[in-house]
Amino acid sequence: GNGASELFLAVVHALKPRNIVIPVPSFYGYEYVAEAAGSYIKYVYLPEENGFRPGRELLQELTADTDMLFVANPNNPTGQLMGREYLQELLEHCRQQGITVVVDECFIEFCESGREQPKFLLGEIGQYENLLLARAFTKSFAMPGVRLGYLVCSNAELREKIRRQLPEWNLSVFAQRAGIACAE
């Protein structure tokens, strides 16, 4: 997509969630797309004493009436990284509640490799049909102004539904070539 933000917008237009949970603090773009979709937003304020790291308070707010959760790993703007065990618990809880989880990993490449292997979600995407994983070349390869992001999802039907929300020619040739060069 033309950056991760365009993909977030395509996701909410494709799925039309009634209720979206957004942890606070978080990237303002989640609120923007939720409002564009006409969704009700439930804000879950993360405790400062825990460094704004999500925990039980977030899980407790994710109930059967929640349709979607937007969460960044690492968090933008705090930089807090969710651990593997917590993420697995979060994804399993959301699966049981029927909640689609959009995990924004646009800053994951900036995490230290020695820390609790932060990039494991990509390898486990097939285990969670309710998981949408977003990343962006813009951040990882220091290409401000080059709008290029991607969304990974194991559910083929859902991928197609989201793709149909994107403009036919949404990527410039420059962005495409830059993405190919970065992938090589």
PLM segments and residue spans:
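PLP-dependent aminotransferase class I/II
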Residues: 37, 130-184
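Hydrophobic residues at beta-strand termini and immediately following loops
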Residues: 1, 44, 134
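Short N-terminal helix/helix-N-cap motif within the alpha/beta-hydrolase-1
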Residues: 3, 9, 25, 79, ...
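Hydrophobic positions in the central parallel beta-sheet of the AAA+
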Residues: 69, 101-102, 151
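Glycine-rich, N-terminal phosphate-binding loop of Rossmann-like dinucleotide-binding domains
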Residues: 2, 24, 73, 110, ...
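Active-site pre-lysine segment of PLP-dependent enzymes
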Residues: 35, 53-65, 77-101, 105-140
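PLP-dependent aminotransferase-like
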Residues: 6, 10-71
